[in-house]
Amino acid sequence: CNTYLQPLLFFKGFQALQAYRVAHWLWKKGRKDMAYFLQMRCSEVFGIDIHPGARIGKGIMIDHAHSIVIGETAVVGDNVSMLHSVTLGGTGKDDEIRHPNIGDGVLLGAGAKVLGNISVGSCSRVAAGSVVLQNVPEKTTVAGVPAKVVGAAGCTNPSISMDQIIKRK
């Protein structure tokens, strides 16, 4: 961004996150109907569906924001970067906590699906198009369907560097 005004006017990922933060505040205050209304409008306007009950940290970056789904019991840590078409969804197998817990500094590639009550460790990378169904250790890179560990994260903070290159041994 060249100015502080650009994200406010032009970046729908930023705009959707701000709408989510208002909806989440309403959700915590017991104003669930208003929170759902904001969620619905955000989904219609931006193509991003973030449940107001989800917990999202600070410093989140949604790049090329479209087709993002974040479920009710999902937890997203600080400084996470996600590209378009990311889903943090449930599998239908769990009753209480149905959605994933994403650690700090994680990079979620385009089209990544992280499903169920699992954790993605801090400073990890999920490759584009991967389907993650099991816990991901810290500072690792996972790829594939279903996702498997393919190496180290490659840097100390993949969400900031946006390094998506997987180095094969």
Indicate residue ranges for each PLM-predicted region.
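Structural signal for interior beta-strand "rungs" in well-ordered beta-sheet cores
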Residues: S43-V150
